[in-house]
Amino acid sequence: MASRVDETTVPSYYYYVDPETTYTYQQPNPLQDLISVYGLDDISRQVARTNLDGTKAVKLRKSYKNQIADLSGKFSTIPTRENGKGGQIAHILFQNNPDMMIQPPQQGQNMSEQQWREQLRNRDIALFQPPNFDWDLCSSVLSQFERSYPSEFANQNQGGAQAPFDIDDLAFDLDGTGKSQSGSNSGNNSKKRKNKSSGSSMATPTHSDSHEDMKRRRLE
């Protein structure tokens, strides 16, 4: 006569197996050739690192260094304050990066809340003082931009002062001629617009051929 099993004394690593059930294999079966199962043989050959004879095939890990070889701001080593790889722009590069800013020690038992805030304030002020911030270098960088893109700075330095806002800089060429529509105001602002109208504007034409223009637009 079989003894009765006390479930309270059965170890936790025991488990019950139902003899009436059968094991169901996982689908897809990882023991199969999944590349062939899903029809990826052609793609796998295109990206294979080695050929069937063992020779090198496609190089997947392409280096980015050749792509940035001509860039003046490239870094082979990520610059930090500690390694000094930032060059002349190091102080500007790190000034507003929280991960690279000098973090004051955490508030301890001997530091009051006011002392902690004062320490943070001194850290932020130091970001804009030498040697953390080089104003001469910033001025030099801006002057280089001005020499490289003179048209972008043309309206900023006329006569040693900032030029007034010119509404014609935002005007649209509605008639498509490249000239200002008002003949009286074309003396000083006779420059052609960069983007000419395609003729689809519904503005009222001011030229003598206005009727033909309207007919053409209606047909379109």
From Swiss-Prot:
It comes from the Eukaryota. The keyword Transcription regulation applies. GO terms for molecular function: transcription coactivator activity; transcription coregulator activity. Keywords: Activator, Nucleus, Transcription, Transcription regulation. It holds the Pfam family Rox3. It is found in: Nucleus. One of its GO terms (biological process) is RNA polymerase II preinitiation complex assembly. Residues 171-220 are annotated as: Disordered. Residues 178-189 have a biased composition (Low complexity). InterPro entries: Mediator_Med19_fun. One of its GO terms (cellular component) is mediator complex. Its main location: nucleus. Component of the Mediator complex, which is composed of at least 21 subunits that form three structurally distinct submodules. The Mediator head module contains MED6, MED8, MED11, SRB4/MED17, SRB5/MED18, ROX3/MED19, SRB2/MED20 and SRB6/MED22, the middle module contains MED1, MED4, NUT1/MED5, MED7, CSE2/MED9, NUT2/MED10, SRB7/MED21 and SOH1/MED31, and the tail module contains MED2, PGD1/MED3, RGR1/MED14, GAL11/MED15 and SIN4/MED16. The head and the middle modules interact directly with RNA polymerase II, whereas the elongated tail module interacts with gene-specific regulatory proteins. Component of the Mediator complex, a coactivator involved in the regulated transcription of nearly all RNA polymerase II-dependent genes. Mediator functions as a bridge to convey information from gene-specific regulatory proteins to the basal RNA polymerase II transcription machinery. The Mediator complex, having a compact conformation in its free form, is recruited to promoters by direct interactions with regulatory proteins and serves for the assembly of a functional preinitiation complex with RNA polymerase II and the general transcription factors. Present with 6116 molecules/cell in log phase SD medium. PANTHER family: MEDIATOR OF RNA POLYMERASE II TRANSCRIPTION SUBUNIT 19. Belongs to the Mediator complex subunit 19 family. This is Mediator of RNA polymerase II transcription subunit 19. It comes from Saccharomyces cerevisiae (strain ATCC 204508 / S288c).
